[in-house]
Amino acid sequence: MVRTYGLTHINLMVRDVKRSLRFYGQVFGVEEYGRSEGLVHARTPGCQDVITFDEQASGAGESRGIAHFGFRLVSPGDIDAAVDEVERAGGTLLRRGEFSPGYPYAYVADPDGYEVEIWYE
């Protein structure tokens, strides 16, 4: 086994870096910490996880075998506010429910069509 610190980042091909940073910032609180030509690096709140937005018109929104990625809620009562925020930021609700009573989830699509799970555990 290779020793690692775990998964550190994902790289999303997006049509519009500014739009993606605005969406993920508004909905999930990610903050830009660096950029280079066509790339913006953003950290998620409370940890060192990174999302890189890679501006490329071709390939944007294509999953290429990745079904979804997720953000875990702090409180199960936050699910309604999370879905509302997604829709205000230009995303869409795909489906929602509960894994079991008191453990809600919602699958949403970002403006490029990437599927994002919002869930509580």
Per-range role (PLM):
Residues M1, A57-A60:
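Short, flexible, solvent-exposed loop/turn segments with mixed acidic/basic and small polar residues
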Residues G38-V40, D49, A67, G102-A106:
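Short beta-strand micro-motifs in enzyme catalytic cores
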Residues M1-R3, L7-R15, G61-E121:
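Vicinal oxygen chelate
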Residues D54-S58, Y120-E121:
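Acetyl-CoA-dependent GNAT
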Residues S36-E37, D78, E98:
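Proline- and acidic/polar-enriched loop/turn elements at helix boundaries
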Residues D49-I51, G59-E62:
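Conserved segment of winged-helix/HTH DNA-binding domains
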Residues T4, N11-D54:
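Core segments of cupin and vicinal oxygen chelate
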